[in-house]
Curated annotation (Swiss-Prot):
Taxon lineage: Bacteria, Pseudomonadati, Pseudomonadota, Gammaproteobacteria, Enterobacterales
Record bears the keyword Ribonucleoprotein: yes
One Pfam assignment: Ribosomal_L36
BP GO annotations: translation
InterPro entries documented for this protein: Ribosomal_bL36, Ribosomal_bL36_sp, Ribosomal_L36_bact
The protein, known as: Large ribosomal subunit protein bL36B
SUPFAM superfamilies linked to this entry: Ribosomal protein L36
Record HAMAP family: Ribosomal_bL36
Cross-referenced NCBIfam families: PRK00831.1, rpmJ_bact
Lineage: superkingdom: Bacteria
Length: 46
């Protein structure tokens, strides 16, 4: 899964990609091609 600053280009990679909000984060999921998964807004580790 990629961590990206913006998911704007990530949602256009494949026609089946969807943007989903879970627990305050935005995810791109793609069931037909799972390598296109991405997340935006992850916590930084200290």
């Amino acid at each position: 899964m990629q961590v990206l600053n913006s998911l704007r280009s990530a949602k256009a990679r494949h026609p089946d990609c969807q943007i989903v909000r879970r627990k305050g984060r935005l995810y791109v999921i793609c069931k037909t091609n799972p390598r296109f998964k991405a997340v935006q807004g992850r916590k930084k580790r200290k």
